[in-house]
A protein has these predicted regions:
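Acidic, glycine-rich loop-and-strand cores that form catalytic or ligand-binding grooves
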Residues: 192
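Catalytic cores of eukaryotic secretory-pathway lumenal/extracellular enzymes that build
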Residues: 1-151, 156-158, 163-169, 177, ...
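P-loop NTPase catalytic cores that bind/hydrolyze ATP
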Residues: 154-157, 182-186
C-alpha cells in the first residue's frame, strides 16, 4: 500500500521478485500472490464522492481481499499513509489479516512520551514539523482550494510532489537523482496528472483528520497480529 504523494510506481521493481523468486536465484516455493492497488481516489482506482480516511480504506481493502478476490487470509504491507492503512487493517481486521509490515510509524495511542528519550524525540519532531507541516495542514483542512489551482497545472503538481520527495529522502549531496531516477519521478507524477486525481488523492488527509488523526481510539486495544 502506497501513500501520498506515492503510487503503485514505487512497487513495480519488486513485484516480479516476490511473484517469481526463482528468476532471481530464489525458490519458487517462496512465491507470493501480490496485490498492488491504488488507494481510493488515487491513480486509476475509483474516486470517492467525499473524503474518506485510512480506516475506511482499510475496510475497503479487507473487503477486496476477502469478498472480491476470495482470499481466506492475507498479509498487508504499507509505507507512509499506506502504513496507516495497514495499521488499521491489523487493528480492525485481524481475523483476515495475519501480519502487517510497515516502514513508517504513523499511528499511536493517545498517551504522551513515556520517558526522557521519547520526550527529546517529540521535541525534535515538533521542531521539524514547523517547516514540514504546511502541505498537510492545507490538505487536511482546505484540499479543494489547493486542487483548483493544481488540476490545470502539470508543473504545479510536479513541483508540489518533487518538493516532498526531495525533503523526505536521504539524498547524497542534495541530489534527488541519488535516490530516484528521472523516469521513476516522472512516472509517479504522471499517474496523478493522467488520471486527474491530484484533488481526490489529497482528500485522504481530510479524511484522516475526521477519523481522529494519528491516534488509535482510547480503548487500550492492541494490534495483536505480528507487526
Amino acid at each position: 500500500l502506497h501513500g501520498w504523494p506515492g503510487s503503485v510506481v514505487e512497487f513495480l521493481h519488486i513485484i516480479e521478485k516476490l511473484t517469481h523468486p526463482e528468476k532471481f536465484g530464489g525458490n519458487i516455493e517462496d512465491a507470493f500472490d501480490v496485490i498492488v492497488p491504488s488507494l481510493p481516489g488515487f491513480g486509476f482506482s475509483d474516486r470517492p464522492s467525499k473524503p474518506i480516511g485510512p480506516r475506511k480504506m482499510a475496510a475497503i481493502f479487507n473487503k477486496l481481499m476477502i469478498e472480491n478476490l476470495e482470499y481466506k487470509n492475507y498479509l498487508a504491507q504499507g509505507g507512509d499513509l499506506g502504513a496507516t492503512i495497514a495499521n488499521w487493517i491489523g487493528y480492525d481486521h485481524s481475523k483476515s489479516c495475519k501480519a502487517i509490515h510497515i516502514n513508517c510509524l504513523t499511528m499511536r495511542h493517545p498517551h504522551g512520551p513515556q520517558n526522557k528519550e521519547e520526550e527529546e524525540w517529540q521535541k525534535r519532531f515538533d521542531k521539524d514539523q514547523i517547516m514540514q507541516d504546511g502541505y498537510r495542514t492545507q490538505q487536511a483542512t482546505k484540499p479543494q482550494t489547493l486542487s483548483y489551482g493544481m488540476m490545470d497545472s502539470p508543473v504545479g503538481i510536479a513541483a508540489w510532489i518533487i518538493e516532498k520527495m526531495y525533503s523526505w529522502s536521504d539524498l547524497k549531496d542534495g541530489d534527488i537523482e541519488s535516490a530516484y531516477s528521472k523516469d521513476t519521478l516522472l512516472a509517479n507524477i504522471m499517474v496523478y496528472i493522467v488520471s486527474k486525481t491530484f484533488n481526490t488523492a489529497s482528500w485522504i488527509y481530510y479524511g484522516r483528520r475526521e477519523e481522529g488523526g494519528r491516534f488509535f481510539p482510547n480503548d487500550f486495544k492492541k494490534i495483536e497480529i505480528p507487526t
